[in-house]
């Protein structure tokens, strides 16, 4: 698998372009939470589903590039089962829906969207899925792919123009932690 080398600045530009096309006020208006789930489902026409992905919650999300089947854990039956999935499906571990994990949920959604945007050509036709476990991989090529997805996820959820606005507000003496919490939707 040939890993595309993408500069951080280019990935951040992709994030700004996505937000600009979806709603320019996310870059220039009042800082607010980026509606990542809505962007996934409306701008990209992807399917967002919530399931228990594994018995051990190490895998937080998966992006499906080809029609096929995936293995999920059934907590009621206490066994793994297969379900059919379509290309363009993002699977998120439903345990992230706990209110205390909202930040991780939003980041995982953005991370999986980033795989779709940045790595679709890399994975399509291979039968592989991009899976996120929240850790840096020891496999160098996998680590590069995950860092790229992390970078785009960050650019989407924390657009630089809005971060700068918040920084300057705080810098001039306003230490409003609530503003930061509201912007991050946590």
Language model region names:
Residues 1-186:
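Active-site hotspot residues in diverse enzymes, especially metal/ion-binding acidic/histidine motifs
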């Amino acid at each position: 698998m040939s890993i595309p080398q993408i500069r951080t600045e280019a990935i951040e530009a992709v994030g700004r372009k996505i937000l600009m096309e979806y709603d320019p006020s996310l870059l220039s208006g009042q800082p607010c939470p980026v509606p990542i789930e809505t962007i996934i489902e409306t701008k990209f026409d992807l399917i967002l589903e919530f399931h228990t992905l594994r018995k051990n919650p190490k895998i937080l999300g998966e992006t499906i590039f080809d029609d096929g089947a995936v293995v999920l854990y059934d907590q009621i039956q206490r066994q793994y089962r297969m379900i059919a999935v379509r290309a363009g499906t993002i699977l998120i571990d439903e345990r992230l829906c706990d209110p205390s994990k909202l930040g991780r949920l939003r980041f995982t959604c953005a991370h999986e969207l980033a795989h779709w945007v940045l790595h679709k050509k890399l994975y399509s036709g291979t039968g592989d899925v991009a899976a996120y476990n929240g850790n840096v991989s020891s496999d160098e090529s996998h680590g590069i792919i995950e860092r790229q997805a992390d970078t785009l996820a960050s650019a989407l959820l924390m657009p630089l123009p809005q971060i700068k606005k918040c920084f300057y507000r705080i810098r001039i003496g306003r230490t409003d932690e609530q503003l930061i919490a509201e912007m991050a939707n946590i």
